């Protein structure tokens, strides 16, 4: 039985990845950070409690990483932990860089010394591209990277150090350059779930307005369930590599908001206002990924933009009607 170790296992991607690997017959171990509200931490993985082995640890605590890897000796490592909110990275840049950059270096060092024959996946991000776009309107593996946020900068260091360790130490270490991906498990401070959750609240009379930032930024949105399948596929290859994971479609925040409100038979114009607090100091205007490289391995998304949002709408309606 293969053993997998997932950092950030109680996050959106980590929880879906754990489910997927368990369904494939893996022995799955996950790392969680101890905090004062453990019940909130475990909400996404509580249903896996009899199948998932959790370990307390932190990417900034090398001793915890060493101890976990020595105990587990995994075949596959998925590093999905980190500070994942782009707007928040402007408020806490030091923590963002420590966690997303130094934290990756820490786990790479532990991996290199303790279980170098394992395969390693790093969660990279389309935010690394910044506003760089190829002439055909896509970002791909070869597109120059010029991030426009502390988050994007932190992920670019992590991406680069993974490539460096791969070449310097002959490690099977790969990057998945994931474009935006959502689900009902997405944090409510991210724009997609914020829009869906608040729209449902408005429909049910629980609130009367939705405040957003830049509604004319475009993103390539997919579903987390599809993207964790891509993570696993990347580590099944004989040689390590870097892959863009995306839907190859782009939609604006305005389009997304309009779709959600229309599904609930409402006109968003009556409820949505712009609040400058949600606008980034430097905006990333447009993302659209060319995922041709990983599609040649047989991956493709099962969810459409619309079916993803429909699932999120249904989730929040059910949540508030309980």
Segments predicted by a language model, with ranges:
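Tryptophan-centric aromatic hotspots in well-structured domains and transmembrane helices
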Residues: 138-139, 159, 187, 221, ...
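Short acidic-hydrophobic sequence patches enriched in Asp/Glu that either
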Residues: 37, 187, 191, 252
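N-terminal Rossmann-like NAD(P)+-binding domain of SDR-like oxidoreductases, especially those catalyzing
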Residues: 1-181, 303, 318
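Short beta-loop-alpha junction of Rossmann-like oxidoreductase domains
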Residues: 131-134, 184-187, 293
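C-terminal substrate-binding subdomain of Rossmann-fold SDR/epimerase-dehydratase oxidoreductases
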Residues: 17-19, 23-24, 30-31, 57-60, ...
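Residues that recognize and position ribonucleotide moieties
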Residues: 121, 137, 174, 188-189, ...
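Short Asp/Glu-rich motifs
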Residues: 40, 185, 313-314
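Heptad-repeat alpha-helical coiled-coil signaling segments
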Residues: 180, 184-187, 216-220
């Amino acid at each position: 039985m293969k053993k997998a170790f997932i950092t950030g296992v109680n996050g959106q991607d980590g929880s879906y990845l754990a489910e997927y690997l368990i369904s494939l017959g893996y022995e799955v171990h996950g790392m969680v950070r101890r905090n004062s509200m453990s019940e909130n931490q475990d909400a996404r993985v509580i249903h896996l409690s009899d199948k998932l082995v959790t370990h307390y640890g932190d990417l900034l605590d090398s001793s915890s990483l060493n101890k976990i890897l020595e105990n587990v000796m995994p075949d596959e490592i998925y590093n999905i932990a980190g500070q994942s909110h782009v707007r928040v990275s402007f408020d806490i840049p030091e923590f963002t860089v420590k966690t997303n950059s130094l934290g990756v270096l820490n786990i790479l060092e532990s991996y290199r010394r303790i279980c170098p024959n394992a395969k390693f996946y790093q969660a990279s991000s389309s935010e690394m591209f910044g506003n760089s776009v190829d002439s055909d309107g896509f970002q791909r593996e070869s597109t120059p990277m010029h991030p426009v946020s502390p988050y994007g900068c932190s992920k670019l260091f992590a991406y680069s150090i993974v490539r460096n360790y791969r070449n310097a130490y002959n490690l099977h270490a790969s990057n998945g350059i994931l474009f935006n991906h959502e689900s009902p498990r997405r944090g409510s401070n991210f724009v997609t779930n914020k829009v869906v959750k608040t729209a449902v609240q408005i429909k049910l009379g629980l609130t009367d307005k939705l405040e957003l930032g830049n509604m004319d930024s475009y993103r390539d949105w997919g579903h987390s369930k599809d993207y964790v399948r891509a993570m696993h596929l990347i580590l099944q290859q004989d040689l390590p590599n870097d892959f863009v994971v995306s839907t190859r479609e782009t939609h604006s925040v305005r389009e997304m908001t309009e779709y959600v409100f229309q599904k609930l038979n409402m006109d968003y114009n009556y409820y949505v206002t712009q609040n400058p607090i949600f606008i980034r100091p430097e905006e990333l205007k447009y993302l659209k990924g060319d995922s041709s490289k990983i599609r040649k391995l047989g991956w493709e998304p099962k969810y459409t933009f619309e079916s993803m949002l429909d699932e999120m709408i249904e989730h929040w309606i059910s949540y508030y009607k309980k």
